[in-house]
From Swiss-Prot:
InterPro entries from the UniProt entry: Ribosomal_uL11, Ribosomal_uL11_C, Ribosomal_uL11_C_sf, Ribosomal_uL11_CS, Ribosomal_uL11_N, Ribosomal_uL11_N_sf
Example GO BP: translation
Protein known as: Large ribosomal subunit protein uL11
Gene behind the chain: rpl11
An annotated GO cellular component: large ribosomal subunit
Keywords: Ribonucleoprotein, Ribosomal protein, RNA-binding, rRNA-binding
Key word Ribosomal protein present: yes
CDD domains: Ribosomal_L11 (cd00349)
SUPFAM superfamilies: Ribosomal L11/L12e N-terminal domain (SSF54747), Ribosomal protein L11, C-terminal domain (SSF46906)
Family: Belongs to the universal ribosomal protein uL11 family.
Disordered: annotated span: 1-26
Length: 159
């Protein structure tokens, strides 16, 4: 590959303007082709900032690798709020179901250090705690302890 460009773009809404256009302008690739390809691949992340890596060759060919948005962005999108709590241990901004927790863990699993869905869900629960999001009406830290205690083993065993 002749070069690599890493940018953060709005899911499904990349355009030839900044930050993508100025980076791709001096390269041999067709900017609009890259933009269209990125939009196709990031459509599922509509409304979220998505990390994208574009690798290109001198002949104008390119490949795109789409990353997963930050865990906090996935949680905010899934539960439907804009800003986390300024006092996450006292003021809660939203409540997440265990199904939503599992969905975010599945979306993020390729970027997490966990080997299974149960542990990935615990990592997501940790982010919920820092955002001020409860899980099934409980403080996320308490819910995480219940996962550790095996209360939801049957739920996470259907992997």
């Amino acid at each position: 590959m002749a070069g690599t460009i890493e940018v953060l773009v709005p899911g499904g809404k990349a355009n030839p303007g900044p930050p993508l256009g100025p980076e791709l302008g001096p390269t041999p690739v067709d900017v609009q082709d890259v933009v269209n390809d990125i939009n196709d691949q990031t459509a599922a992340f509509d409304g979220m900032e998505v990390p994208v890596t574009v690798e290109y060759d001198d002949d104008g060919s390119f490949s795109i690798e789409v990353g997963v948005p930050p865990t906090a962005a996935l949680i905010k999108d899934e539960v439907g709020f804009d800003t986390g709590s300024g006092e996450p241990q006292e003021n809660f901004v939203a409540d997440m179901s265990i199904e939503q927790l599992k969905k975010v863990a599945e979306q993020k699993s390729s970027d997490l250090l966990s080997y299974d869905l149960k542990n990935a869900s615990k990592e997501v629960a940790g982010t919920c705690a820092s955002l001020g999001v409860t899980i099934e009406g409980e403080d996320a830290r308490t819910f995480k302890q219940r996962i550790d205690g095996g209360d939801f083993d049957d739920y996470f065993d259907d992997e």
